[in-house]
Amino acid sequence: MEGPGVHDPLLELFDQSNGVTTDSRQCGPGLLYIALKGERFDGNAFALEAIRKGCIAAVVDNPDVKGENLIHVPDGLDALQQLARSHRQRFQAPVFGLTGSNGKTTTKELIRAVIGQELKVHATQGNLNNHIGVPLTLLSIPVDTEFALIEMGANHQGEIAALCTIAEPTFGMITNVGLAHLEGFGGVEGVKKGKQELYRHLASKGGTAFVHAADPDLIALSNLEGLERLPYGTPNHPPHAWRSAGSVDAPIYWSVSAGAAPGPWHDGQGALEVHLHGAHQLANMQAAIAVGVHFGVSPGAINAALGAFLPVDQRGETVTTERNTVIVDCYNANPSSVESTLRAFASAGHEAPLAILGDMMELGSHAAHGHRMVRDVARECAVECWVVGHDFAAHAPGDRTFPDVNALRSALAEEGIEGRTILLKGSRSMRM
C-alpha cells in the first residue's frame, strides 16, 4: 500500500488499531469502535461497553456520552466515511467499482476468483455494499492488497455517486440496468441515471469502464467524454464467451480474437465446464473473463477459476434432497432477474419443473405490472408456477397461490412433492 501521507488524528488512531467495527457485539481488544445511529438503535449507548471490551477508543457523536478513550465528532457516519476515504487515498492499487440491477454479487465473486489467480484481491464481503458497508470494506483492505473490488448497491439516485466519492474507483463495471428498486429510483429512467453515476465518476477521473457490448443501454450510458471504454462480450468485442447449440448446460467456450473465426481459447484444456446456468450467468462470466484478460491473468488460470466456481449462498445454488432437486435463488428478486431466471430454468430440460415465486419488493407503482409480466413469462415458458405473497395474489395468481410462506410450507408438508426440480425465487424479505 502506497500513496501520499494523510495527517488525520482519527486515521492515526486507526493505524494503531486492529480494525474498525460499528457493531458493539463485535467489539474486542485493539478495535476502534465508531458509533452509528439507526432507526431502532443508537450506537452511542454502547460506547462505554466497547471500551470495557477492550476497544482502544470509541467515536461518538452524542456530547452527553462521557468517559475515557472517547472521541467526539459531529456525526459518526460522516466520520466513518471520511476515515475510509482517507485510508483509500493512501494506496495506489486498482480500485474496481461494481454495480448493476442484477448479478452484482455473482459477478463480483467471479472476478475475485479470476483476478485472485494472479493478484492479492480484497473484495466486498457479503452485502456490505451501502453507505456503511463500503467504508467498512475499504477500512478492512490489507496493506499488501493488489486489487480492491468494491460492490456498490443503491436504491435511490445519488447513492452511487456518494459511494464513488468515498471509494474513488479507477476501474468500474455496471452489470446491467433492469427493473430493480423502481420505487426508490422513480422508474426505469431513474435506475439508468442512478447506475450511470459510476460511469460519470470514472469519466471525471479519466478512469476505465468495462462495458458489455451486447447491452445497448450500457453502450449509451457509457458514451461520456473522458471515459475509457473497454467493450466486451460479442464476437466483435472480445473476450466473448458462448455455449454451443445455445444450451444452458452445454460447455462454455471463449475467445479473445476479434474478427477471426470463432474458436475456443481454452489453453489446451478442452471446453470449460462450469457450475452456473442461464444466459444471465453467461454474461457474468464474460465480465469476469474480460477483467481477467485485461489484468494479465492467463487463459489456463481463468479456466481454473471459473471451473471451480460455485454459486454463492442463495444465488442459484442447487440443493439435492431425498425427494427433489431445489435451485435456491432467494437472495433478491425483481422482474428482470426473475424473467431471466425463469427462461433459463425452462430451457434447461429439467424433469417435472416447478417454479415457486415470491413477491418482488420495492416496485412501488410498478408492482402490478411487474408481477403480471413475470407470470406471463412463466406461461410463455410453459412452467408450472406457484406464487407466494400479497402482490402475486392480487395481480398475478399462479397455478397455485399462497398468501405467505407459512401457507406454502403447510401445503408442502401435507401433500409432499417428489421427483421434481423446483426453482425457489423471491425477494429476501419473503423468507423463501
Positions of predicted regions on the chain:
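AMP-binding/adenylate-forming catalytic core of the ANL superfamily
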Residues: 191, 333-394
